[in-house]
């Protein structure tokens, strides 16, 4: 597999994770996520030992949705966890976890930083997604873009500074609120994937000097 193919595959994983945080799973998305091609994708992802448990939870949840009621329950989980903004939710914005303020504001420093990154890459948050730019879905979508358009050093810096720096805190909050465990599994998978990607992107230490 060429480096171009590897980067494309990495981008697909980031795009998938981004989509799961961007909106609730509807009927059409469920069909896509449980299609034959998707099953092969999940299977391939689960071969990595550190990803297996999270992938299995995600797959079992998606494959277990057989009626509208169960699908609506998953949609309700998404809304309750990410859209309500109470102590029983886990807002997916970097600003809320990286700010030193007691009551951090949305559209803060991390939002401004991400907006600048997007502007430099001639990208923008779509109008149908009216969220601050430091939303996890935006960051993961941007990383998918970087996989195919930027040097490894740029990708590594972005992951370490803008993503890995707060994901663990987000997961800690999310796991306390997520009774059904689907979105916790998605978040844990995201962190494990990011950690693995960072390890791959870090320059190898010289054997001799």
From Swiss-Prot:
- Keywords per UniProt: Chaperone, Cytoplasm
List the Pfam families: Nitrate_red_del (PF02613)
SUPFAM superfamilies named among the record's database cross-references: TorD-like
Q: Does the keyword Chaperone apply?
A: yes
What transmembrane ranges does the database entry give? Answer: none
UniProt xrefs under InterPro entries: Chaperone_TorD, DMSO/NO3_reduct_chaperone, HscB_C_sf, TorD-like_sf, TorD/DmsD_chaperones
A GO cellular component annotation here is: cytoplasm
Q: Which GO terms describe its biological process?
A: protein complex oligomerization; protein folding
Location(s) in or outside the cell: Cytoplasm
Give the principal location in a single coarse category: cytoplasm
Keyword Protease attributed:
no
Q: Describe the family membership recorded for this protein in Swiss-Prot or TrEMBL.
A: Belongs to the TorD/DmsD family. TorD subfamily.
Described purpose of this protein according to its UniProt entry? Involved in the biogenesis of TorA. Acts on TorA before the insertion of the molybdenum cofactor and, as a result, probably favors a conformation of the apoenzyme that is competent for acquiring the cofactor.
Q: Which NCBIfam families match?
A: PRK04976.1
Designated name of the protein: Chaperone protein TorD
Organism name: Shewanella baltica (strain OS185)
- Gene name of this polypeptide: torD
């Amino acid at each position: 597999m060429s480096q171009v193919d590897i980067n494309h595959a990495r981008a697909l994983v980031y795009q998938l994770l981004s989509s799961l945080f961007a909106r609730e799973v509807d009927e059409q998305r469920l069909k896509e996520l449980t299609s034959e091609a998707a099953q092969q994708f999940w299977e391939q992802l689960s071969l990595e030992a550190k990803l297996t448990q999270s992938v299995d939870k995600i797959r079992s949840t998606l494959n277990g949705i057989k009626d509208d009621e169960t699908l609506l329950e998953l949609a309700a989980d998404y809304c309750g966890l990410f859209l309500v903004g109470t102590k029983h939710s886990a807002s997916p914005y970097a600003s809320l976890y990286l700010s030193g303020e007691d009551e951090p504001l949305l559209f803060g420093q991390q939002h401004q930083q991400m907006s600048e990154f997007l502007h430099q890459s001639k990208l923008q948050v779509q109008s149908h997604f009216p969220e601050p730019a430091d939303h996890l879905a935006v960051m993961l979508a941007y990383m998918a873009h970087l996989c195919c358009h930027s040097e490894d050093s740029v990708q590594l810096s972005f992951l370490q500074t803008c993503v890995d720096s707060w994901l663990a805190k987000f997961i800690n909050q999310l796991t306390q609120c997520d009774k059904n465990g689907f979105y916790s599994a998605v978040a844990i998978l995201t962190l494990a994937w990011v950690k693995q990607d960072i390890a791959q992107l870090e320059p190898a230490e010289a054997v001799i000097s």
